[in-house]
Every structure is written in structure tokens, then in C-alpha cells.
């Protein structure tokens, strides 16, 4: 291990112990905001420090085994040889784990997100597929104990959605969903197809991190046009009786957001503003990324919603992620919400790219 990395790990270990002591200080406990801030830092440091401790234990085991290689007892020497091999293998893996843990963390990884799904080519079948995708992400969210709220929806004529926007809240949401942005393609025989022909349809998915601080995005109220209208869809007696739904247009960019989920106009406006901030921030970051000269394009992809990233082939029970040439024959499990076998390889590829760029 490089001396600079070891020095950094020693500093992180010292800070971990310092924060641990502060968290038991009654003066800190009484200040809720400070206690929350330190608790978050402690939780972020813990996996790094624990891994570093295991790495140090493995190094100690290597030294002890080497000493026993010269023992007069043949059985003891053989045992030391086996233990040395195991400790060396363990230390190599732990060093790799530490390198990944020390990679710069995207500050947005812990953010909640807005999940946008829009039906593309394919008419009714595309809208039905949009509904399938929304159900897939909702079930994945359920497995992760995340909360999903629909912000706005436009139902398809024969099921599914022409468009559905939802807010997904919980731990590590953006980190796990950030590579879902792009065009998702489905190949299957529609229920309405009498000849049994396979149709191809597509939907676009966009993952927008929620903006936590108002200061992150500067919006001039004069740049906004706010319209109210009557909500449509489920809602019992209140439907079409009050203008509770909100449509906000950001005039300089032309971005339009809507929210009709809540019965309160005030709540709908707050949700719509939150979505608008996320869209404006995402737009600015996309522009910045395009302007930056990149020596190579990321295999994981740019997050451009027009980029075809994945195909769901029902006749073959196959799902293929085109960015990393990943093919799995477990389509049914994935669309039922078991997304980790797709998401984890994408994260690993991203980490490998970052490690390669750091070592270049």
C-alpha cells in the first residue's frame, strides 16, 4: 500500500475515534443539528475504518505466519504456510476494498430522486411498458424500504402511463438509481397481437436528484408562470371541484412541471417547485458535463435519456444492459423488482473506471 494512502487512512481512523467521543458528549447530544451532522459523518467513516482494521489484522497475520515458517516442527511449518497464503490473499482483497471506499463520493449519492418514465415509440404497448417499469422500480423501492410518491401521471388509454413522475425517498437512492437514466427497450408479443408477432417498444427514464437546499438553484420568481387547474384521476368528491393542481413554467428554459397528487394547492406547488429545481440543476450539470473535455467516454454511459441502455426481451426471458454487455436470463425476477443483479455490476464498472482514471 502506498504511504500516502496509509497516512490518509490513519487520519480517518483518528477522526472516527474523535467523532465517536463527541457523540457521547452531553453538550453535543443536546444540539440536535450538530448531533445529526456528526452521526452522519460517523456512519460514513465506519466502513472505511473497519476495513482498515481488518487489513491491519491481515498484515499482522502475515508477519506471524512468516516467523513460524522457520519453526522446527514440520506440521507447524505447513500450517504457517497455509495461513500465510490465506492472509496474503485476504490483505490483497482488503486493499482493493479500501481503494474503492476511498474513491471520491458523489455528494448527490444520498439524495432522494425524481423518477420520470415516459412512453416513447410503440403506442399503447409503450405506455403499458412504462407501467411495467414504474411497477419494477416501485417494488425495488419496497425491497430497499424507500418511499414512492406519485407527483404527476398521465395514464395510457389501454393501461400503463404515457408519463409518470414520482419522488423516491430513502437511503442511498440516487447512488443506486443514477445509472437508470436512458432509453429502455422492450421486445414482446402484445396481448392485442393476434398473429403472435414480436413488437419493439421503448420508454425513456430520467433520474433527477432532489435539490435539498434552496440555495443550490437560484430561481427568479419573475421567470415563473404559475397556472392552476382541476386535478383529474382518483380523488373522490374533490375531483374537478377545486383548482388544486399546479403547473409551473420556467420561462427562460421552457421547462414545465406539474403536480396534481395532493388535494392542497400549497402542497402541490411545493412539490412542483422541488421538481423544477431538480430539473434545472440536472440541466445545468448535463451542460457542464458536455462542455468538459473528456479523454474517454464512460462505459456506464452519460445518463443521456436518449441513449439506449437496456433491452427487455420477453420471448427469451433475457435482459441486456448494452453499456457493459451484461446479459441475464432472469427477466421475470428483474421486472418483479430484483434489480440488484443489474445495478451492482454497473456500480462495479463505474468504480473500476474511477480507479483506472486515478491511477493513470
From Swiss-Prot:
<dbReference type="Pfam" id="PF03462">
    <property type="entry name" value="PCRF"/>
</dbReference>
<dbReference type="InterPro" id="IPR005139">
    <property type="entry name" value="PCRF"/>
</dbReference>
<comment type="function">
    <text>Peptide chain release factor 1 directs the termination of translation in response to the peptide chain termination codons UAG and UAA.</text>
</comment>
<dbReference type="InterPro" id="IPR004373">
    <property type="entry name" value="RF-1"/>
</dbReference>
<dbReference type="InterPro" id="IPR045853">
    <property type="entry name" value="Pep_chain_release_fac_I_sf"/>
</dbReference>
<keyword id="KW-0963">Cytoplasm</keyword>
<dbReference type="Pfam" id="PF00472">
    <property type="entry name" value="RF-1"/>
</dbReference>
<feature type="modified residue" description="N5-methylglutamine">
    <location>
        <position position="237"/>
    </location>
</feature>
<keyword id="KW-0488">Methylation</keyword>
<protein>
    <recommendedName>
        <fullName>Peptide chain release factor 1</fullName>
    </recommendedName>
</protein>
<comment type="similarity">
    <text>Belongs to the prokaryotic/mitochondrial release factor family.</text>
</comment>
<dbReference type="GO" id="GO:0005737">
    <property type="term" value="C:cytoplasm"/>
</dbReference>
<keyword id="KW-0648">Protein biosynthesis</keyword>
<dbReference type="InterPro" id="IPR050057">
    <property type="entry name" value="Prokaryotic/Mito_RF"/>
</dbReference>
<feature type="region of interest" description="Disordered">
    <location>
        <begin position="286"/>
        <end position="307"/>
    </location>
</feature>
<dbReference type="GO" id="GO:0016149">
    <property type="term" value="F:translation release factor activity, codon specific"/>
</dbReference>
<dbReference type="InterPro" id="IPR000352">
    <property type="entry name" value="Pep_chain_release_fac_I"/>
</dbReference>
Amino acid at each position: 500500500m502506498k504511504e500516502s494512502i496509509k497516512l490518509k487512512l490513519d487520519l480517518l481512523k483518528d477522526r472516527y475515534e474523535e467523532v465517536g467521543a463527541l457523540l457521547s458528549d452531553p453538550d453535543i447530544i443536546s444540539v440536535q443539528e450538530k448531533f445529526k451532522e456528526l452521526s452522519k459523518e460517523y456512519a460514513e467513516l465506519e466502513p472505511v475504518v473497519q476495513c482498515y482494521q481488518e487489513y491491519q489484522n491481515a498484515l499482522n497475520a502475515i508477519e506471524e505466519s512468516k516467523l513460524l515458517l522457520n519453526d522446527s516442527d514440520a506440521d507447524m511449518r505447513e500450517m504457517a504456510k497455509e495461513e500465510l497464503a490465506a492472509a496474503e490473499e485476504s490483505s490483497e482483497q482488503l486493499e482493493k476494498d479500501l481503494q474503492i471506499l476511498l474513491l471520491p463520493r458523489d455528494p448527490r449519492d444520498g439524495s432522494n430522486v425524481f423518477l420520470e418514465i415516459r412512453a416513447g415509440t410503440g403506442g399503447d404497448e409503450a405506455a403499458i411498458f412504462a407501467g411495467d417499469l414504474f411497477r419494477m422500480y416501485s417494488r425495488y423501492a419496497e425491497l430497499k424500504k424507500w418511499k414512492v410518491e406519485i407527483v404527476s401521471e398521465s395514464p395510457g388509454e389501454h393501461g400503463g402511463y404515457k408519463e409518470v413522475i414520482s419522488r423516491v425517498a430513502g437511503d442511498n437512492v440516487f447512488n443506486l438509481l443514477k445509472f437508470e437514466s436512458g432509453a429502455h427497450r422492450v421486445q414482446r408479443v402484445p396481448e392485442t397481437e393476434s398473429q403472435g408477432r414480436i413488437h419493439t417498444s421503448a420508454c425513456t427514464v430520467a433520474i433527477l436528484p432532489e435539490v435539498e437546499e434552496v440555495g443550490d438553484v437560484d430561481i427568479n420568481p419573475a421567470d415563473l408562470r404559475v397556472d392552476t387547474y382541476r386535478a383529474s384521476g382518483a380523488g373522490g368528491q374533490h375531483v374537478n371541484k377545486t383548482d388544486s393542481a399546479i403547473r409551473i413554467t420556467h420561462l427562460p428554459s421552457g421547462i414545465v412541471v406539474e403536480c396534481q397528487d395532493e388535494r392542497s394547492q400549497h402542497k402541490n406547488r411545493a412539490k412542483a417547485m422541488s421538481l423544477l429545481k431538480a430539473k434545472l440543476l440536472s440541466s445545468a450539470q448535463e451542460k457542464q458535463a458536455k462542455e468538459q473535455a473528456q479523454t474517454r467516454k464512460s462505459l456506464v454511459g452519460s445518463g443521456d435519456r436518449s441513449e439506449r441502455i437496456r433491452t427487455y426481451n420477453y420471448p427469451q426471458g433475457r435482459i441486456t444492459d448494452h453499456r457493459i454487455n451484461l446479459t441475464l436470463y432472469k427477466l421475470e425476477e428483474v421486472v418483479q423488482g430484483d434489480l440488484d443483479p443489474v445495478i451492482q455490476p454497473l456500480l462495479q464498472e463505474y468504480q473500476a473506471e474511477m480507479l483506472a482514471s486515478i491511477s493513470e
